Amino acid sequence: MKFLLAIIATAAVLLAGQASASEALAQKSGCLACHGVDKKVLGPAFKDVGAKYKGDKGAEAKLVAKVKAGGSGVWGPMPMPANSPQVKDEDIKSIVHWVLSL
C-alpha cells in the first residue's frame, strides 16, 4: 500500500510540474495576455475551452489550426490574432494539449 501511495504521489508531482511548464510556455508565448486559466479575460478561460472540446477527437488539430491562423466568432466578437510564425508549431501543440487537459 505504501508503494502504491508513493507512485501516486510521484505521478502527481510530475503532472503538476508538467502543468506548470505548460502554463509558463503559455505565458512566454503571450497567451495569458488575453486568456486566464480559470477566468475569461479578453478571450475565453482555458478551462472553458477544455470543457467545450472535451470528448472531441479532432479538437487538438482544430485548436492548433485556430491558434496558428487566428480567427473570430467562436467565443464572441473579439478576434484572436494569428500566432504563427512567432510561436513555434511545437509550442502551440504543447499549449493546446495542456489547455485540453484542464
Task: List each language-model region with its residue ranges.
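N-terminal export/targeting leaders of redox proteins
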Residues: 1-22, 102
